[in-house]
Regions:
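A broadly tuned "polar low-complexity/structure-edge" signature
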Residues: 9, 17-18, 22, 81, ...
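C-terminal juxtamembrane segment of a hydrophobic transmembrane alpha-helix
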Residues: 16-17, 21-44
Length: 149
């Protein structure tokens, strides 16, 4: 019968396993915080782009009613990822709608412009889908923007 002598070969493979685990641990400790930061920034970008797109739907509806004249009406369906307050202002020449977003690092104001200059309203929209009515009545001189329930 032949005796097989392993010697210290088992210890060598155990050292390789332990050293590779330490390297993987160090790499994960460095890469996970970087990955989480990148995910936060990408979520902020997605929220900003989505908010700008949804705000543009509302301002396009205001422009449509303004261009169509009295008696026009448009209903817009918007979808926001969070609760928002839309402020409709004007600077004397043209109007603008703005949303204040709280991002991961600071606050940012998203703005979209429209041609009508008589709106001064604030609309609260809840997270999810909301229906917005933009109408210009025949007997009114102001375009009305309100949330439909």
């Amino acid at each position: 019968m032949k005796i097989i002598n392993i010697g210290n070969k088992g210890q060598l493979s155990l050292e390789y396993i332990l050293s590779s685990m330490i390297v993987i641990l160090i790499i994960s400790l460095i890469s996970i915080p970087i990955l989480l930061t990148a995910m936060d920034y990408s979520n902020d970008i997605i929220d900003s782009i989505n908010s700008k797109s949804e705000l543009s739907k509302i301002t396009d509806a205001i422009d449509f009613c303004y261009a169509s004249g009295k008696g026009s009406k448009r209903i817009v369906l918007v979808d926001f990822n969070r609760n928002v307050d839309i402020r409709l202002h004007n600077d004397g020449k043209r109007g603008f709608a703005s949303i204040n977003l709280n991002l991961s690092d600071d606050s940012k104001e998203i703005t979209s412009y429209f041609d009508c200059n008589g709106l001064n309203e604030k609309i609260h929209l809840s997270k999810g889908f909301n229906r917005i009515a933009v109408k210009w009545d025949d007997d009114s001189n102001v375009i009305e923007v309100k949330r439909l329930i």
